[in-house]
């Protein structure tokens, strides 16, 4: 009898605490960018800020974030991830899947599809996404393609 009651009580408490923990949204920046740049700790085992404070890498992978989402969608996505406590967004500049020609904003990514001729408008958009992430305290783990 006591065992059954204990199990029920534990399950009930688990449900209560799990539900209440999901009510509060994160209100601050995801990471404290004022602590300096990131570097590998001298032990080689983890990342830290330049002031020596350990950095917790909680990443979300959005490979085609830059090329698929427009400005409004990007703002919503980054805000959603900031609220959830992510610290890093992993993405690429040039996606390899469907088309590499045009971004979601309708701008070409490359001039004449030539990798040696980046389109200035698209790369202004790339800079904007990175700046928006930084304003929210999110780091961007960026791959070229």
Predicted regions: what they are:
Residues 1-23:
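Bacterial Sec-dependent N-terminal signal peptides
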Residues 26-145:
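Active-site mouth of glycoside hydrolases
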């Amino acid at each position: 009898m006591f065992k059954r009651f204990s199990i029920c009580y534990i399950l009930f408490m688990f449900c209560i605490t799990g539900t209440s923990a999901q009510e509060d949204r994160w209100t601050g920046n995801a990471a404290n960018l004022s602590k300096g740049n990131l570097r590998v700790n001298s032990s080689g085992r983890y990342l830290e800020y330049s002031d020596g404070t350990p950095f917790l890498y909680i990443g979300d992978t959005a490979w085609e974030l830059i090329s698929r989402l427009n400005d409004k969608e990007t703002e919503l996505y980054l805000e959603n991830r900031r609220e959830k406590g992510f610290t890093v967004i992993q993405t690429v500049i040039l996606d390899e899947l469907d088309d590499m020609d045009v971004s979601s904003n309708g701008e070409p990514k490359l001039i004449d599809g030539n990798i040696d001729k980046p389109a200035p408008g698209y790369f202004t958009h790339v800079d904007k996404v990175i700046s928006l992430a930084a304003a929210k305290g999110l780091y961007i783990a960026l791959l070229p393609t």
